[in-house]
Each structure stands twice: as C-alpha cells, then as structure tokens.
A protein has these predicted regions:
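N-terminal hydrophobic/helix-forming segments and targeting peptides
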Residues: 1-369
C-alpha cells in the first residue's frame, strides 16, 4: 500500500466515537510522539433499551444516567434528544430533536413547592433518584380504533406514530438505539462583558476542540516529531470498552503507522511509546467565590491566569491518578515561559473534598510521560 512520509496526515475513526489524528514528523518514530489527548463524552442521560411507556395521560421515557451527574440539576430544564437508531436492515437513523428554533423540547418534572413537604425532609440523594429521571415525551392520545384493544396505550401510540412518520422507526428499534438526553440550546456568552461561555459539555469538549484546533493550525508544517491527537470516548465511566482509552485502538493505529513508514516491529513500538510525551487535557475546577470552602486558595486555579497544569489528579491520597514527573513538569514550564504562555499550577479542590481523574493514567501505562 501507499507509504507515509514526513508531512503525511492521516486519521483513524473508531466506531464514530474515538478519533486519532496523526501528522508524520521528520524524525524516526522510535524517537517518540508529541501527543494531545482529550475525551469527547460528557455526563448525560441515556434512554433505556425499553424506554417508552404511558402513565396517567402522559407518554414517558425512562433514562439511565451516564457519568457523574448531580441528578437535581436535570429536572425542570429544557432537554434535547441526540443519537442514532440502528435498524435491523443495517440502516442507521440520526436523531436530533430540541435544538432548532421550531423544535419541541423535553423535560423532567419536579414537585411544585406547595406539595414538597416530604421532599424537603429528604437529603438530596433521596429526593432525586436515578429512577425518577423520566422524560415527559407527549400528552396527546392517538385516535381510538373500533376493534377491541385499539383503545389501549393511546398516548404511547401517538408518539410512536410521530416517530415513525419522521424517522421511520418503531418501538422495537429503541432496543438498538443510542439516544442521549442533554440540555437543549446553543452555547451563549456569559456575563455582561461576554467574558465566559455558558454551554453544556465543557467537560471535555472545550479541550477536545482546542486540541484538534492546535493540530489543524499546524497542518501546513512538517514537524520534527510526529504529532498525534487522541479524542476518546467513555472517560466519564472509566475509559472502558472498545472506544475508551483502555482499549488497544491507539496502539493498533500506531502499529499501522509504523508499518506504513518503514515497517512494524514490537521493539520499535515500545521505544516509540517510551520516548513519547503527552498533554492530557481535561477541565479543572476554577475558584468559585460562591463555594470557596471546597478550594484551597493557594492551590486553586483562577480565571484570567491562563491554562491550568495539574501534576496529578485523583482523590484522597491521589488514588486513581497519574503523577507526572518533576522533570516533565519542568520541561513544560520551560516551554511555556520561553513562548510567553501564561499558565498556573493547581490542584482539583481541597484534599478529601472529592477529586477526579482523566485519561492520563491509562496513557502513562504505555510508559508515556
């Protein structure tokens, strides 16, 4: 097949959920890669395999939350549906409802304040449970038929008729669908000075976009070392599965690249990974004056002070963390300072307050800095 040379640009798509961009450099791959990495999944609600039911004059959808959500944040707000429905004939139908100006939106109801005495007596985890996050999908019945049984589940039938007319899908097709429920609406400027961005999915699409943008902006040059950008799925639930960072997709891609640039062998692959360096980018927790008690001020990131470097993340005693070496942090500091990049070193909140992790720990297992 066609060989890759310095300056060649290729990409690999893993099941439409993980992307690897590669720009081949001048140096031999055994001298290492310069890698950017971010995840493209975000906390959300997923429809269950059998989501649709009706109750008391409403057509409803059951959901199963994905990732670390605060359940109470998802009630009484406009929601949109995004995803795909894979049909038995092999076709895949894209679904997007709730983003266009004329689209309907969806929602999860809450108890009105007048009747919330019992709810107020519960702690927040008891007041809002995963099984309570049911989507109000419709409230108009279909016309009843004349035959026996045709007057049942009329609210459910009506929404199914609409879905079939618009998308050609049936109730059974939900079983092979991946439909996500997310906050409806486009990104907007936040603040009278328009200094911030109000949007769903900052975690981690803000880093995914900037990583891709960085590689595309350098597409016209031939780098010394090979550039790689990794956009991965399933970070919010542990980087698992065939499209998460724990999969073999990244290594498989680089094995193909080695094969197309002079020949694959296992030792060269190991040397390449060991000599590689990565910036694993994910969101941090900026200091919020409304919740100052969860931050330790000397080690909190602040607005206006540039991107944040975390030497480690994790929780408690750095559990579940990648702890970058002091030498690598020093190298990054030198590069940023020499290029007049403003940055800050920080931690993710107070010790024992919570914590978090990202894909770095899985990449570092390949002996990547």
């Amino acid at each position: 097949g066609e060989k890759l040379t310095a300056g060649s640009k290729v990409y690999a798509n893993n099941r439409n959920k993980m992307l690897v961009l590669v720009q081949v450099g001048k140096k031999d791959l055994s001298e290492g890669l310069n890698i950017l990495g971010a995840h493209i999944d975000s906390p959300r609600l997923d429809l269950k395999p059998n989501p649709l039911y009706e109750d008391s004059g409403f057509a409803m959808l059951k959901t199963h939350y994905y990732g670390g959500i605060k359940k109470f944040q998802w009630v009484t707000m406009p929601l949109a549906l995004h995803g795909v429905v894979a049909k038995k004939d092999g076709t895949v139908v894209k679904v997007a409802i709730g983003e266009e100006a004329g689209d309907p939106v969806f929602g999860i109801s809450d108890i009105l304040p007048h009747l919330a005495k019992d709810q107020r007596s519960k702690n927040i985890n008891e007041a809002f449970t995963g099984e309570d996050l049911n989507i109000t999908f419709g409230s108009t019945p279909a016309e009843a038929g004349s035959s026996e049984g045709e007057d049942k589940d009329l609210f459910k039938k009506n929404v199914l008729n609409i879905l079939n007319e618009k998308y050609g899908i049936t109730e059974e097709d939900f079983q092979s669908a991946e439909i996500e429920v997310v906050p409806a609406g486009a990104a907007r400027d936040l603040g009278i000075d328009r200094s911030m961005v109000y949007a769903y999915g900052h975690d981690d699409r803000i880093c995914a976009y900037t990583s891709v943008r960085a590689q595309l902006d350098l597409a016209g040059e031939v780098p010394e070392k090979t550039y790689v950008t990794l956009l991965v799925d399933k970070e919010e639930i542990g980087s698992v599965g065939a499209t998460g960072m724990q999969s073999k997709f990244f290594e498989n891609c680089m094995a193909e690249i080695l094969g197309l640039t002079g020949g694959y062998d296992e030792l060269k692959m190991r040397r390449m990974l060991s000599a590689s360096k990565m910036l694993s980018s994910d969101v941090s927790a900026g200091f919020d004056p409304n919740y100052a008690n969860v931050h330790e001020k000397n080690n909190a990131p602040y607005f206006h002070y540039g991107p944040v470097l975390h030497k480690y993340t994790g929780s408690g005693g750095k559990s579940g963390s990648n702890d970058a070496t002091a030498e690598y942090i020093a190298e990054l500091r030198k590069n940023f300072d020499e290029n007049d990049v403003r940055y800050q070193m920080a931690e993710l909140g107070k010790v024992d307050q919570g914590g978090g992790g990202t894909v770095a720990k899985f990449v570092s297992q390949r002996e990547v800095d």
